[in-house]
């Protein structure tokens, strides 16, 4: 697999979605959970980032995951409704996946190969963020505690790179 563009994932409705649909875009790929202490700040700041940078080609791809403290027990429809209602935000939401272990989604295998974590490659918690360039390669991996607003400099650099 040369880039994320060679991977197909399932959207929140369960339909195959090739990530090649996002070729030429800068992506934030993030594992999300509705009942996490990091939920509010991340969703609010993702919305703010998209309000500013979507016109330049930024997309946030949110992958619900229930592997950390069981903090995403809901189905995709309920997750989308929760985020839209509470945050007035409609991220591009995909089907719930595993990001670690035997059933790790192919996308997350690729992301972790491209940018391993500190000490271990495993995703450590909800809201681990990967910034992916227009070419489909991971530019940087951000820890769960990194706030989206603190990614601005890297996002702007990625948006300016016309690969």
From Swiss-Prot:
GO terms for cellular component: cytoplasm. This is Glutathione peroxidase 2. Pfam families: GSHPx (PF00255). Its main location: cytoplasm. It is an enzyme of class 1 (oxidoreductase). CDD domains: GSH_Peroxidase. The gene is gpx-2. The keyword Flavoprotein does not apply. One of its GO terms (biological process) is response to oxidative stress. PROSITE patterns: GLUTATHIONE_PEROXID_1, GLUTATHIONE_PEROXID_2, GLUTATHIONE_PEROXID_3.
């Amino acid at each position: 697999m040369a880039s994320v563009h060679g991977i197909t994932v399932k959207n929140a409705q369960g339909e195959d979605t090739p990530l090649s649909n996002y070729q030429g875009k800068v992506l934030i790929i993030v594992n999300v959970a509705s009942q996490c202490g990091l939920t509010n700040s991340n969703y609010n700041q993702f919305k703010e980032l998209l309000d500013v940078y979507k016109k330049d080609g930024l997309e946030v791809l949110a992958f619900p995951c229930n592997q950390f403290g069981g903090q995403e027990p809901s189905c995709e429809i309920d997750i989308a409704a929760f985020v839209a209602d509470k945050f007035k935000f409609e991220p591009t939401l995909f089907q719930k996946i595993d990001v670690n272990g035997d059933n790790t989604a192919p996308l997350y295998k690729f992301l972790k190969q491209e940018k391993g974590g500190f000490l271990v490659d495993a995703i450590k918690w909800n809201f681990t963020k990967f910034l992916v360039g227009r070419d489909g390669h991971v530019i940087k991996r951000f820890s769960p505690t990194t706030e989206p607003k603190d990614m601005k400099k890297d996002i702007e650099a990625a948006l300016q790179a016309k690969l």
